[in-house]
Swiss-Prot record:
Binding site for Zn(2+): C900, C903, C920, C923
Cofactor(s) essential for the protein: Zn(2+)
Chief localisation class: cytoplasm
UniProt entry keywords in alphabetical sequence: Aminoacyl-tRNA synthetase, ATP-binding, Cytoplasm, Ligase, Metal-binding, Nucleotide-binding, Protein biosynthesis, Zinc
GO terms for cellular component: cytosol
Name used for this protein in its record: Isoleucine--tRNA ligase
InterPro entries, per the entry: aa-tRNA-synth_I_CS, aa-tRNA-synth_Ia, Anticodon_Ile_BEm, Ile-tRNA-ligase, Ile-tRNA-ligase_type1, Ile-tRNA_ligase, M/V/L/I-tRNA-synth_anticd-bd, Rossmann-like_a/b/a_fold
Binding sites annotated in the UniProt record for ATP: K605
Source taxon at top rank: Bacteria
Species this chain originates from: Alcanivorax borkumensis (strain ATCC 700651 / DSM 11573 / NCIMB 13689 / SK2)
Quaternary structure note: Monomer.
Motif ('HIGH' region): 58-68
């Protein structure tokens, strides 16, 4: 038996079937770095229209997690797809480097600033720690295949950046948005300082729970407002912090709640007590109120500014409205001490109530106070309760175990205490109304993002930007000791400070002798030692990064972060940008969801469902992680697990194997000399290129709209259905058996080349490592990297009136699927071994006959059978079942003819040639003659 293998055009490629991503990807990263790929992209696209995606800075602490990976991969896909679209799309990554978590890590190593080490040394250690964290995270982000200016990232702790933060504060001062005021903060009596939220732990605590009556001062006013007859009504509050009652300045009701007056006897004493109607039954029982009558309801909205008597002090307090008032517990009325609670403080600001906190830094009440003067907070509950008993205003005393804020260091209960702070005012210079206006100009994706940030800005309180921390950018201001006014030369002073910080970092401020800048005035001014909220640091990146770097600009085209950033970075960026430039810092804001496991549960070490990106790239490769990010609809929760990633691996193999088939069949093809013009190509080849053009247009639109999961679907379906399920199977015979330089084969190779060029670009933003590997295996001239390319422009369309256009081939595909199903049935019934051992008879109506007869003898190459015959539908045997195609029935017969040793078709002329008794006539023509001629398939 002669071996005809050498006469076939068998596929050849250096592109391996086994991806080996976890081994190959690091080498590819090294290559990109050595060739300075990012800089080459910048040079190649210089002068093109800009697209600026501004990177929200992750915090420089700890290893990156799966959420970080999602965020960076999404950004990378956008930047790469924008580059393909012809934009100059620089990507400058950044890190948030100041703040409490870093302080806590450094404290564990060197002790607290001002105790075991001086503040300057502590800041130096913080800077060193943050630098190490940045280095580790940077390495991990690069490992994901993210291209960016990794050699020049922005760090909020860089001296120049710190200086520009101070300059941005100066602009906010210039524009009239900064004010000094009081705000309640968590205060640790043991630390003697304010605590940030991250330093607060919640533990169970037993506290006194008291119901307290606030008698109405003007009964006639109450009766007139409520329509309720009463002689000595009182409004009742419930509190677990009796010690705060000396600072009470109001009682809050909800304007939309209804209230009733309960008249009855309590321990033999007649009482008239106003409470929320929804809680009345519970309170009657809890208090043991007897002989109760209940009034008609009165709306809370009618009680505003009703005067009440303080329950044990010589003072009157008003009724105010509070949206925070609920009927979840208590009485539906809330004791309001603006100096001791955030909600109370907000209400107090609306009503201009004094946010007094009579508690000193050391936890002692001021000496001049009645009842509690000179006492420590921890000792004040009992005398307050006794005073309430004496005045007859204690309705009920009980104990309650509840969750209460504690100091994370000392494990002791905290108090809320109003202290002097610095604020960005929402209304002083109209910042909040401007924010609402500007929101309408921004595109929010998904659309619900707009409603979310609008809701968060509704009645937003002033932004407290001051922190009593060591590791942060200073609020570099001088305040007059007598008037509390800022120095009149503040703008010039801020610039002088910024210039010093640019050279020496924030220590330049903390070490500064005010006389160096103020001269003889130094004694009249205090140097502010507070630091800025880290949300201010990251919030002004539009000024410190976009405005300062030549290749960037503000506003950015896109901000992209997790859905929690409507409260965080999106908002701090918007407010600071409006305060500085009176415009939003972004044109579009895109939000992604959080990662959960396959059951929708949050990632948790205790549950054991954490997927670490480091494990994924070490095991499966970063491209698998990237494919998962692309395939998942990121606008909701993103499910990930080992099983899900394994499924992604299967999808990846489909795309890789399809690409490998294309490359292996381009062996020996030189585009410059071998490619055919569209009019020279076979009909099927022209169709598949037209189909690729159609898919490319869809994919480009999907990338432009950030619909990445649909990009994945289009990419996967084109590989699996258009190519794998139709075109590639059909062309194998022509590709392998026709003469190497025949029109039939070169037509096919031309189509494969165009498809490969397009396909590699479609996948490049997603499967970045794999795309580069494919690209370097393409024949012909290439750029230095696929990431220097733009969308492929070599695809072409079929004319709308083409003889064998889209509609024709779509119907042929339907018929082929019907044939495939019939062949599978025959194979299952062991009638045939494979499709080439079969002959099919297609019983067709007039419409199907007109369609399929146009392929002539080449119909068998489409059905991939040894023969394909058309007969009238009326002649179909009765036992033949209908197919999925109207007017088509399929009969599968085992071929009686001998099998050609070269093409494996069963043909009647096998054996008719004496020199090649094992070949069919077609193969003899291809081996020794002029070669067969194909027209369609």
């Amino acid at each position: 038996m002669t071996d005809y293998k050498a006469t076939l055009n068998l596929p050849q490629t250096g592109f391996p079937m086994k991806a080996g991503l976890s081994q190959r990807e690091p080498a590819r990263l090294k290559e990109w770095q050595q060739k300075q790929l990012y800089q080459k992209i910048r040079e190649a696209f210089a002068g093109r229209p800009k697209f600026i995606l501004h990177d929200g800075p992750p915090y420089a602490n700890g290893d990156i997690h799966i959420g970080h990976a999602v965020n960076k991969i999404l950004k990378d896909m956008i930047v790469k797809s924008r580059t393909l679209a012809g934009f100059d799309a620089p990507y400058v990554p950044g890190w948030d480097c100041h703040g409490l978590p870093i302080e806590l890590m450094v404290e564990k190593k060197v002790g607290k600033a001002g105790h075991k080490v001086d503040a300057g040394t502590f800041r130096k250690k913080c800077r060193e720690y943050a630098s190490k964290q940045v280095a580790g995270q940077k390495s991990d982000f690069m490992r994901l295949g993210v291209l960016g200016d990794w050699d020049n990232p922005y760090l909020t702790m860089d001296f120049t950046f710190e200086a520009n933060i101070i300059r941005s504060l100066g602009k906010i001062v210039d524009n009239g948005h900064l004010q000094q005021g009081f705000k309640p903060v968590h205060w640790c009596l043991d630390c003697g300082s304010a605590l940030a939220e991250a330093e607060v732990e919640y533990e169970d605590k037993i506290s006194p729970a008291i119901d307290v009556a606030f008698p109405v001062v003007d009964v006639a006013d109450f009766v007139a407002r409520s329509g309720i007859e009463a002689s000595a009504p009182a409004l009742v509050i419930w509190t677990t912090t009796p010690w705060t009652l000396p600072a009470n300045r109001a009682v809050a009701v909800h304007p939309e709640l209804d209230y009733v007056l309960l008249s009855g006897e309590l321990s033999g004493v007649a009482r008239e007590l106003l409470v929320a109607e929804a809680l009345a039954d519970d309170l009657v029982t809890r208090w043991g109120l007897e002989n109760v009558t209940r009034s008609a309801a009165v709306a809370g909205s009618k009680l505003e500014m009703l005067a009440l008597q303080h329950p044990f002090l010589e003072a009157q307090v008003p009724v105010v409205f509070g949206e925070h008032v609920t009927t979840d517990a208590g009485t539906g009325l809330v004791h309001t001490a603006p100096g001791h609670g955030v909600d109370d403080f907000m209400v107090g600001k609306q009503y201009d109530l004094d946010p007094i906190s009579p508690v000193l830094d050391n936890g002692l009440f001021r000496e001049d106070l009645p009842v509690v003067g000179g006492l420590h907070v921890s000792k004040a509950n009992e005398p307050v309760i006794e005073a309430l008993k004496d005045s007859g205003n204690l309705v009920k005393l009980a104990k309650i175990e509840h969750s209460y804020p504690h100091c994370w260091r000392h494990k002791t209960p905290l108090i809320f205490r109003a202290t002097a702070q610095w604020f960005v005012s929402m209304d002083q210079a109209g910042l909040l109304p401007r924010a609402r206006q500007e929101i309408d100009k921004v595109q929010w994706l998904p659309e619900w993002g707009k409603a979310r940030i609008e809701g968060m800005l509704t009645d937003r309180p002033d932004w407290c930007i001051s922190r009593q921390r060591t590791w942060g950018v200073p609020i570099a201001l001088f305040v007059n000791k007598e008037t509390s006014e800022l120095h009149p030369q503040t703008p010039a002073l801020i610039e002088q400070v910024a210039q010093r910080v640019e050279k020496a970092g924030v220590d330049a401020w903390f070490d500064l002798d005010p006389a160096e800048l103020l001269g003889d005035e130094a004694d009249q001014y205090s140097k502010v030692t507070d630091t800025l909220d880290v949300w201010f640091d990251s919030g002004v990146t539009h000024y410190c990064v976009l405005d300062q770097r030549e290749q960037l600009r503000a506003p950015a085209d896109l901000y992209l972060e997790g859905s929690d950033q409507h409260r965080g970075w999106f908002q701090s960026s918007l407010l600071t940008s409006l305060a500085i430039r009176d415009a939003a810092p972004y044109s579009t804001v895109l939000t992604h969801g959080f990662t959960v496991d396959e059951h929708g549960r949050k990632m948790s070490k205790s549950v054991g469902n954490v997927i670490a990106p480091q494990e994924v790239w070490n095991d499966l490769g970063a491209d698998i992680l990237r494919l998962w990010v692309c395939a998942t609809d990121y606008r909701g929760e993103m499910s990930v697990s080992k099983d899900i990633l394994k499924q992604m691996g299967d999808s990846y193999r489909r795309i890789r194997n399809t690409s490998r088939f294309l490359l292996s069949n381009l062996s020996g093809f030189e585009p410059a000399t071998d490619a055919l013009q569209p009019e020279q190509m076979l009909a099927l080849d022209r169709y598949i290129v037209d189909r690729a053009l159609q898919v490319q247009a869809e994919i480009q639109d999907l990338y432009d709209g950030y619909h990445f999961h649909q990009v994945y679907q289009k990419l996967h379906n084109f590989c699996a259905l258009d190519l794998g399920g139709f075109y590639l199977d059909i062309i194998k015979d022509r590709q392998y058996t026709t003469q190497a330089d025949s029109v039939a084969r070169r037509s096919c190779q031309t189509a494969l080349y165009h498809i490969a060029q397009a396909l590699v670009r479609w996948m490049a933003p997603v499967l970045s490592f794999t795309a580069e590997e494919i690209y370097e295996n393409l024949p012909g001239e290439r750029l230095d990297s696929v990431f220097l390319a733009e969308w492929y422009d070599g695809l072409f369309a079929l004319a709308d009136n083409a003889d064998m256009g889209r509609a024709f081939w779509d119907k042929v595909q339907d018929a082929k699927q019907a044939v495939n199903k019939a062949i599978e049935g025959a194979r299952a019934a062991k009638l045939i071994k494979g499709s080439l051992s079969a002959e099919v008879v297609l019983f067709v109506d007039a419409e199907q006959n007109a369609l399929l007869q146009r392929l002539g003898d080449e119909l068998r190459f489409v059905t991939i059978t040894s023969a394909a015959v058309l007969k009238p539908l009326a002649e179909a045997p009765a036992e033949l079942e209908d197919t999925s195609v109207a007017g088509l029935k399929v009969q599968v017969l085992a071929s009686d003819h001998a099998k050609c040793a070269r093409c494996w078709h069963h043909q009647p002329d096998v054996g008719s040639h004496a020199e090649h008794p094992e070949l069919c006539g077609r193969c003899i023509t291809n081996v020794e003659g002029d070669g067969e001629v194909r027209h369609y398939a």
